[in-house]
Structure formats: C-alpha cells, structure tokens
Amino acid sequence: LVYERSEEKMSKQIYLDNAATTQMSDAVKQAMEPYLQENYGNASTAYSIGEDARRELEKSREVIAATLHAKTSEIYFTSGGSESDNWAVKNIAAACKKKGRHIITTNIEHHAILNSCEYLEKLGYDVTYLEVDGDGLISPEQVMDAIRPDTTLISVMFANNEVGTIEPIYQIGKIAREKQILFHTDAVQAYAQIPLSVNYYPVDLLSASAHKFHGPKGV
C-alpha cells in the first residue's frame, strides 16, 4: 500500500497489491445485488425464488466453464482457493490410496497445499517436496525423477503468489498423463491473467478464486 501524505494525516490510499486481493468490480456488484436483496432464495429449493437463484448459479457456472473450455459439470464452487486446494489434494489422496500413497509437490506452494500435505503425512502418506532453482522454477525432469510406482497425485502451482514465477505446467501435465497420475494446479494467481484452457493444459484439477480478479470473496 502506498499513501500520499498530507499535513494532517495519510488521506489518500493507492492500492498496489492486486496479487493479494482485488476490489470487486461495479459490474459484479450490480449482477449480484438482486440476489443479495429480493432474489435471495436457496438455490437447492424447489419453489420459484430458489429456482431463480439456481438458474443464475448455473449461468455463472457456464460462464466460468467457457473461460476454461471446460464442461459445466466440471465446475465446482467452493468457499475460495484454499478450500479448493484442500478439496483437491485430500480427496484425490483418499480416492487413490489403494493405488498408492505418494504425492509430489513443490516447496513454494500456497499453505493450503503444504498444510494438506502435512496432514496427509500424519496419515501415513509420503510427500516429495521438489525444490526450485535460483529462478524459482522446477523442471519437468525433476518431476519425472520423483515419480514412483505408488505416486497418485502431482500438485504444482501455476503462478507463484510471492515471486510471480510461472511453472512449466504444460510439460508437467504431459508427464502426468503419460504416467497416468492425476495432476492438480493451483491457478489462483494465473486465472484471468494467463489464458487457460483445459483442452490445452493437461490438468485434472485446477483451483481459482474470484477475489483475485475483481469478483467476490468466498467463491
């Protein structure tokens, strides 16, 4: 945050931290307002006010799916990027535990990933934390070398939230597909900044968060 200092107090704020969060756009506020006021129905209910909310929810799902070239059935709304990361790592680990209990990630992931991996280690999972080089990057070769017969998940951040490095997600995804290992990327800092298509990037799970691109917090 940068402040313009006046004689009496710091009165004017210039915000320069959009990597942390963004101001909600006026267009988003206008689109949401009817559903915070008169059209406040529960989208899971069968009566009209709930059905109206459900229709708008599905329209939103279609919009998000289109930006990723994904199917609407592949879009899940959570309370934010951290829950999305938790959901991906813990659920894939649980679903694939009969196949193996080895996970590959990096040492520069968001705490939502690192904490989930630490939790799984307490349950008996083995986690390999790849170290980045001097430029803050990991290489596809590192990923390949870390893969074991019992590896069931690879999770690598798309764009780092502190230093801004962009990892080789396409190449890592290709390796994961060849080895039939599920691949998750935390794209919270990349979505809406870098063109993303699940038809191009070979990812199985991708996390994003609306408050990083002028949307509401908690989505």
Regions found by a protein language model. Name each.
Residues 2-219:
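Pyridoxal 5′-phosphate
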